[in-house]
């Protein structure tokens, strides 16, 4: 395959799919390389299929942490996606933004443009939140389908209420204006199937002529000439 690309992105994971979409929609040519296969495994798309993916070597790197005294010197299994969509294709589909204080902390340490006020517009741009919410914090019309759980178990209601009785504030939207406290999770689902970044961002990017995707392509090194790869 010969393709003269403005950008080569290594890894079609949660970030790689988004960057491919954003660059290509601006007219840049992009070559996206992924070590794993296409996301055609049926369990990738069925929400309950996550149980079959947590250690499946076909779509999972199956990393392990280094032994630490605090964990009893154990190696902890650390699933990471090895498939189009990366870990967004094998995770539990929960949608949880980072805490605003973390972003503000990065900005205070010198990471300009990374305060929560700076990144919030991109959170809003990326999502299509189906359950309303504060329009200053939630977005509609984006490729990432975000919704509240359609079925909530009685045990979940009891857990949230117990947290509230224990003194934690109850948040109506943990991804909205009140991320602290206890509340209900949200998920990324497209129709009745998983809403990975491969099915949302990359699905529209790959229709463009300026995008090429190569799966099962392991990158072993980079060659630079005059500061260009």
Summary of predicted features, one role per range:
Residues 107-226:
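Conserved redox-cofactor binding core of oxidoreductases
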């Amino acid at each position: 395959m010969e393709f003269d690309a403005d950008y080569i992105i290594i890894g079609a994971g949660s970030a790689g799919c988004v960057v491919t979409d954003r660059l290509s929609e601006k007219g840049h040519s992009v070559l996206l390389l992924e070590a794993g296969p296409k996301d055609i495994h049926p369990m990738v798309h069925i929400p309950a299929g996550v149980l079959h993916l947590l250690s499946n070597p076909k779509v999972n790197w199956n990393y392990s942490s280094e032994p630490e005294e605090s964990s009893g010197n154990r190696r902890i299994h650390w699933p990471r996606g090895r498939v189009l969509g990366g870990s967004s294709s094998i995770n539990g589909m929960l949608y949880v933004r980072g805490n605003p204080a973390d972003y503000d902390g990065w900005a205070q340490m010198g990471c300009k443009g990374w305060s929560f006020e700076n990144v919030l517009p991109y959170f809003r741009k990326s999502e299509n939140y189906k359950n309303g919410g504060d329009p200053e914090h939630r977005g509609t019309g984006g490729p990432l389908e975000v919704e509240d759980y359609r079925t909530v178990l009685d045990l979940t209601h009891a857990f949230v209420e117990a947290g509230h009785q224990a003194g934690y504030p109850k948040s109506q939207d943990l991804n909205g204006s009140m991320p602290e406290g206890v509340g209900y999770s949200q998920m990324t689902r497209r129709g009745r199937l998983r809403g990975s970044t491969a099915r949302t961002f990359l699905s529209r990017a790959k229709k463009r002529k300026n995008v090429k995707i190569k799966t099962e392509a392991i990158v072993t090194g980079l060659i630079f000439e005059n500061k260009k790869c």
